[in-house]
A protein has these predicted regions:
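Nucleotide phosphate-binding/pyrophosphate-handling subdomain across enzymes
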Residues: 1-129
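C-terminal helical cap/extension that packs against the catalytic core
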Residues: 57-58, 98-175
């Protein structure tokens, strides 16, 4: 059954739903295999990771915490995705260093404390380049500071507009 979602957590939730359905069947509830499969197929993707298009590959992810960034990187690495550009628009400086580090290494701040072997800029990563944009209602000076922080982890560039970032990301892609 093709699932409407990506990621380990969503797949785990699907497995729990199947097991719960089977447990109810053992308690004499009438749930057919077809009903379980139809239910899985009908699930709407409410996760932050969304594939917008396949060619070129465009993924929209609303991640903004180190934990969400690490989860996104795990999904991309599991799918063996490489040579992507990321467009990032953060509204706060607090936690930005941990966010960029997690997006680079796949490790949350807690995991990074345990694993000292990962140095910034040395990890295999799906992102060839990241473009930073200023979200509406956010100060451009903040995005300038965030771009400097991002440069410790990625080839990072500040863009004046989202349209400019999309144009540059598309021009930079090495994917079909």
């Amino acid at each position: 059954v093709p699932l409407a979602f990506l990621g380990r957590h969503a797949a785990g939730n699907a497995a729990v739903a199947v097991e719960l359905s089977l447990a109810l069947c053992r308690k004499d509830f009438d749930i057919t295999d077809e009903a379980i499969l139809e239910g899985l197929a009908a699930v709407e993707n409410r996760s932050s990771i969304r594939v917008v298009s396949q060619r070129p590959l465009v993924i929209l992810d609303a991640c903004r915490t180190p934990q969400q960034a690490a989860a996104l990187l795990r999904v991309l690495n599991m799918a063996k995705v490489r040579h992507m550009s990321a467009i990032i628009g953060l509204t706060e400086e607090e936690g930005a260093e941990a966010f960029f580090s997690a997006l680079e290494t796949g490790l949350t701040p807690e995991e990074q404390k345990k694993d000292k072997s990962t140095m910034p800029g040395m990890s295999e990563n799906p992102f060839d380049k990241v473009y930073l944009v200023t979200p509406q209602g956010t100060d451009t000076a903040l995005t300038e500071r965030l771009t400097e922080k991002a440069k410790y982890h990625f080839d990072a560039e500040l863009c004046a507009t989202l349209a400019e970032a999309v144009r540059l990301a598309h021009a930079n892609t090495r994917r079909g």
